[in-house]
Amino acid sequence: MLTFPLINDTSRKIIHIDMDAFFASVEVRDNPSLKGKPVVIARNPLQTGGRGVVSTCSYEARAFGIHSAMSAKEAYDLCPQAIFISGNYEKYTKVSKQVREIFKRYTDNIEAASIDEAYLDVTENKIGAQSAIKIAKLIQHDIFVELGLTCSAGVSYNKFLAKIASDYEKPHGLTLIMPDEALEFLAKLPVEKFHGVGKATVPKLHALGFFTGGDLQKADPVDLAEKFGIYGWELFQKANGIHNSKVKNHRERKSVGKERTYGKLLYLPDDIKAELIKISKQVSESLKRHQLKGNIIILKLRYSDFTTLTKRKSMVENLDSPEDIAEAAQQIFEEIDYDESLGVRLLGVTVSGFGVQKATLDMQ
């Protein structure tokens, strides 16, 4: 019989900082006339023949139902008065570095999750504060006063809960989840709010009767693992407030990937799938060279307007063969809302999740 040890480290003090509508907020800051207006970071569909994808948008735009990864045309249809801005990634990167410098006043134990969010372990910190809430408030204050931007903060004893907390109250929110509050907090949370649960997984969980964290808390972890592989076990742990992944200041290499840029744009889905086969073969060769297998496949697609889509898929088995990787990458491609009119200038396939094989063995 499989055994699942439940080891929960509640001694850490973790903060997750998520910049509020980051790209749009930077544009509003730099152009105050945009304040209070629906701002969409995407090329204007009236100037591109309806092409383009939304990177992000202001909260005023979100009130109309606009969201990231939506087509610019659909965003325009929802809100014709929206102000479309192509965006300036170089500027956003510069501001992101300024935010990180503020983090460094309090701790060097910082893990950047993306350009607009990061985890901070402040268990030991530079100002000798016992309260992580105090540090989170200071960071919010510094970012607002010095950079003219707001962020939401989540505080808890692990990264998963800190991320959940930062999403709980936006914008400019601050939420604390204490160890003795975690189970009750998670029990009420819909499974789609669990970080890492993708759109494809939600209906599968619903079909099995799992709608909330409380449902997962009452589940048989062995049954979840049989249905979802190691991911099912991780879901059970998260629903019970357990996530012992440490904040990593310098991330070790945990993935193998290859990208191709095309001088001649790709339009036809069949052409894109054919290229994914070629790229998957290169990834497979690299994996085998390093004697690695992974259960997470990531597809990266960049349109001609430089809008980039990234989508991942968790597999039950560890993969390293070109056929399996290509099949998974093609499945992901079929799941995205591909805009054939834009043309693709870059494709990438990445495999990660190398620790899964060991974790599976540990449960036997």
From Swiss-Prot:
Pfam families, per the entry: IMS, IMS_C, IMS_HHH
Top-rank taxon, per record: Bacteria
Entry keyword annotation includes DNA damage: yes
Cofactor note: Binds 2 magnesium ions per subunit.
Chief place where the protein resides: cytoplasm
Annotated active site: 117
A GO MF label: magnesium ion binding
Compartment list: Cytoplasm
SUPFAM superfamilies per record: DNA/RNA polymerases, Lesion bypass DNA polymerase (Y-family), little finger domain
Alphabetical list of CDD domains matching this protein: PolY_Pol_IV_kappa
A GO cellular-component term linked to this record: cytosol
Record key words, sorted: Cytoplasm, DNA damage, DNA repair, DNA replication, DNA-binding, DNA-directed DNA polymerase, Magnesium, Metal-binding, Mutator protein, Nucleotidyltransferase, Transferase
EC number: 2.7.7.7
Co-factor requirement: Mg(2+)
All residue ranges annotated as the UmuC domain in the record: 14-198
Family according to the record: Belongs to the DNA polymerase type-Y family.
Subunit architecture: Monomer.
Known role: Poorly processive, error-prone DNA polymerase involved in untargeted mutagenesis. Copies undamaged DNA at stalled replication forks, which arise in vivo from mismatched or misaligned primer ends. These misaligned primers can be extended by PolIV. Exhibits no 3'-5' exonuclease (proofreading) activity. May be involved in translesional synthesis, in conjunction with the beta clamp from PolIII.
Name this protein carries in UniProt: DNA polymerase IV
Gene that specifies this protein: dinB
